[in-house]
Amino acid sequence: MFKKFDEKENVSNCIQLKTSVIKGIKNQLIEQFPGIEPWLNQIMPKKDPVKIVRCHEHIEILTVNGELLFFRQREGPFYPTLRLLHKYPFILPHQQVDKGAIKFVLSGANIMCPGLTSPGAKLYPAAVDTIVAIMAEGKQHALCVGVMKMSAEDIEKVNKGIGIENIHYLNDGLWHMKTYK
């Protein structure tokens, strides 16, 4: 999604949100990520201005004080940015890939089933369409945010094809954006 993303070319406008809209977004985030509720006022303080940065391909990035927190495409689900995920790693369930998959994931490739079932990888129970943080064997922080394309059970059974779709990874265009004022 952000492989060829460039802040100067892809951002179309930025709007400040009303309190009622912010409340709706917070409720949607709590519904989507139940573990985030105790931390939401710390992530999105009440007095700080919340803005939506609109980009090409119907992508919206939610920012607070210029810090990129969440993004979504069209009216779809919100995904946390990796910078937020590194501060609050418990927001998303984790899946772990083996060392051999790291370079492919960091180049934007989807996570294939064998990279999740080999030694060194850890596959935790998760349903289809669950948003997950992809961790790497021997690494502390998440290297990608993805969406389960198969359930964990099916990944173990089939062990072929795309298991997790790579949505946002380290060093992609969104990662390089850092802040937006």
From Swiss-Prot:
Function in brief: Translation regulator forming a complex with DENR to promote translation reinitiation. Translation reinitiation is the process where the small ribosomal subunit remains attached to the mRNA following termination of translation of a regulatory upstream ORF (uORF), and resume scanning on the same mRNA molecule to initiate translation of a downstream ORF, usually the main ORF (mORF). The MCTS1/DENR complex is pivotal to two linked mechanisms essential for translation reinitiation.
PANTHER family reported in the protein's UniProt record: MALIGNANT T-CELL-AMPLIFIED SEQUENCE 1, MCT-1 PROTEIN
Primary location class: cytoplasm
Residues the record lists as Phosphoserine modifications: 118
Subcellular location: Cytoplasm
Keyword terms of this UniProt record: Cell cycle, Cytoplasm, DNA damage, Growth regulation, Initiation factor, Phosphoprotein, Protein biosynthesis, Transcription, Transcription regulation, Tumor suppressor
GO biological processes: DNA damage response; formation of translation preinitiation complex; IRES-dependent viral translational initiation; ribosome disassembly; translation reinitiation
Related illness: Immunodeficiency 118: An X-linked recessive disorder characterized by increased susceptibility to disseminated mycobacterial infections in infancy, notably after Bacillus Calmette-Guerin (BCG) vaccination. Initial clinical features include fever, lymphadenopathy, hepatosplenomegaly, abscesses, and osteomyelitis. Affected males usually recover with treatment, have no other infections, and show normal growth and development.
Domain PUA: from-to ranges: 92-171
Tissue note: Ubiquitous. Over-expressed in T-cell lymphoid cell lines and in non-Hodgkin lymphoma cell lines as well as in a subset of primary large B-cell lymphomas.
Stimuli inducing this protein: By DNA damaging agents such as gamma irradiation, adriamycin or taxol in lymphoid cells, but not by stress stimuli such as heat shock. This induction of protein expression does not occur at the RNA level, and does not require new protein synthesis.
A GO-annotated cellular component: cytoplasm
Notes concerning its domains: The PUA RNA-binding domain is critical for cap binding, but not sufficient for translation enhancer function. MCT1 N-terminal region is required to enhance translation possibly through interaction with other proteins.
Gene field: MCTS1
Record family assignment: Belongs to the MCTS1 family.
This protein's name: Malignant T-cell-amplified sequence 1
Subunit structure: Interacts (via PUA domain) with DENR; the complex regulates translation reinitiation.
